[in-house]
């Protein structure tokens, strides 16, 4: 461990196990990193508010890379980097998906704000439970900033490939992943 300069970790399935917990062995390793003053960075597609409960619960001191790199915060949670699409562009994508009549729920993320048109949708409620964060009922126009870092579409697994392919074909300028 003495030759390590920095350690990066994804959250789901890497840092957290299937029960959404850090194992005792992993936690010991993280505490050793802190003791040796080796920087630890959490990287996730989650929002900052979806990462912070983990940081607080386990007493971690780390920078975070959220939205798969669209927003980077240092240990003091100051913004180091951010890049997203405009609300207008996000609205175009959402309008397109509405015209397709896809059976899905969506959430839009800007810095640490998460909006969705229906907080009572079971798919959104499940996401809230997983990330231990709360969505705000609203639409893109309700977002405080003009920068959208992530659009999340939640659908039945049988629809995922179709929706992904359709969005990639219509919006090749954006990174669309499942």
Can you say where each PLM-predicted feature lies in the sequence?
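Short, basic/glycine-rich phosphate-binding loops at helix/coil junctions
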Residues: 9, 71-74, 142-146
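Active-site phosphate-binding/coordination module
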Residues: 21-123
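Short, Asp-centered acidic motifs that coordinate Mg2+ and/or phosphate
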Residues: 6, 63, 151
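Short loop/turn elements that form and flank the Walker-type P-loop nucleotide-binding site
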Residues: 2-3, 37
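Conserved acidic, metal-coordinating active-site core of Asp-based
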Residues: 103-178
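Conserved residues at the C-terminal ends of beta-strands
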Residues: 10, 67, 154
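Short loop/turn motifs at secondary-structure junctions
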Residues: 3, 59-60, 147
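Asp-based phosphoryl-transfer active-site loop
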Residues: 3-19, 93
């Amino acid at each position: 461990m003495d030759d390590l300069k920095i350690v990066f970790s994804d959250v789901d399935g890497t840092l957290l196990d299937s029960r959404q917990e850090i194992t005792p062995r992993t936690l010991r390793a993280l505490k050793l990193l802190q003791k040796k003053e080796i920087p630890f960075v959490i990287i996730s597609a989650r929002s900052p508010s979806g990462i912070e409960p983990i940081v607080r619960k386990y007493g971690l001191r780390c920078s975070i890379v959220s939205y798969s790199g669209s927003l980077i915060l240092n240990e003091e949670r100051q913004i180091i980097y951010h890049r997203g699409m405009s609300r207008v562009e996000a609205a175009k994508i959402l309008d397109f998906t509405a015209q397709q009549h896809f059976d899905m729920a969506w959430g839009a993320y800007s810095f640490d704000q998460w909006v969705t048109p229906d907080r009572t949708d079971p798919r959104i409620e499940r996401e809230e439970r997983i990330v231990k964060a709360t969505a705000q009922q609203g639409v893109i126009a309700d977002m405080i900033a003009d920068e959208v870092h992530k659009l999340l579409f939640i659908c039945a697994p049988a629809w995922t490939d179709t929706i992904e392919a359709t969005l990639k074909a219509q919006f090749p300028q954006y990174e669309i992943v499942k």
